[in-house]
Amino acid sequence: HTTPYAGLIYDINDNWSAYASYTSIFQPQNKRDKAGQYLAPITGNNYEAGLKSDWMNSRLTTTLSVFRIEQNNVAQATTIPIPGSNGEFAWKSTDGTVSKGVEFEVNGAITDNWQMTFGATRYVAEDNEGNAVNPNLPRTSVKLFTRYRLPAIPELTVGGGVNWQNRVYKDTTTPYGTFRAEQGSYALVDLFTRYQVTKNFSVQGNINNLFDKTYDTNIDGSIVYGAPRNVSLTANYQF
């Protein structure tokens, strides 16, 4: 299947440029309906436009974009079991889904030794009747990452990041009423330190989920908790 793409970039001046793009969507799915048949591929259109800036020879770059995604055959979870599937629940297709939102990202070298990245996304997704589509996916997310190389010990780099998302939920209708599973907003903090032993060899230590946040990653079904606080040590050699 061929998916057309078209894009246009206009340089406003030495620092600013504007762009617009269009992409056709064709995405096969691995979800099955109540008859056990795989859902038809997602089809639709993706429109995006925005502004980009570049300052001080790319030491600071920014991107601001708006987007609109029109889709048919979008999978949504149901509570109907698929016969003979050992407990697998069926999915249904939803047509006329429209997602629209805005994204912002800034990347900068604050100093020669200190880099930082910040990004945020906000969008809404509704079907042709105005109902929320897949509210189990976060509508707002924010990320911040930074790293710093110590001037006194240039082989040593430390850094970390924060990823935040808003609350998500899933409504399930049963003969006894409608029940809502919900995961509140949460932030995950990660840290790392890397030491460049030689030009080709480095070691790195990571602490993931620093504050040991408990969160559910699967409110569609049974509770699946995200990884608790964990520590890892890796070695890397580049030939």
Q: Where are these predicted regions, by residue range?
A:
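Residues that define the transmembrane beta-barrel architecture of outer-membrane proteins
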Residues: 2, 43-47, 58, 98-100, ...
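Residue-level signature of outer-membrane beta-barrel architecture
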Residues: 8-12, 41, 51-55, 108-109, ...
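Outer-membrane beta-barrel channels and translocator barrels
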Residues: 13, 44, 56-58, 99, ...
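Repeated loop/turn-to-beta-strand initiation elements of outer-membrane beta-barrel proteins
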Residues: 15-18, 57-62, 113-116, 153-158, ...
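Membrane-embedded beta-barrel scaffold of Gram-negative outer-membrane proteins
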Residues: 17-21, 42-102, 107-109, 116, ...
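Extracellular loop and loop/strand-boundary signature of outer-membrane beta-barrel proteins
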Residues: 31-39, 87-93, 101-103, 127-134, ...
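C-terminal beta-signal and adjacent terminal beta-strands/loops
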Residues: 70, 164-173, 191-239
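Gram-negative outer-membrane beta-barrel transporters
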Residues: 91-173, 211-214, 234-236
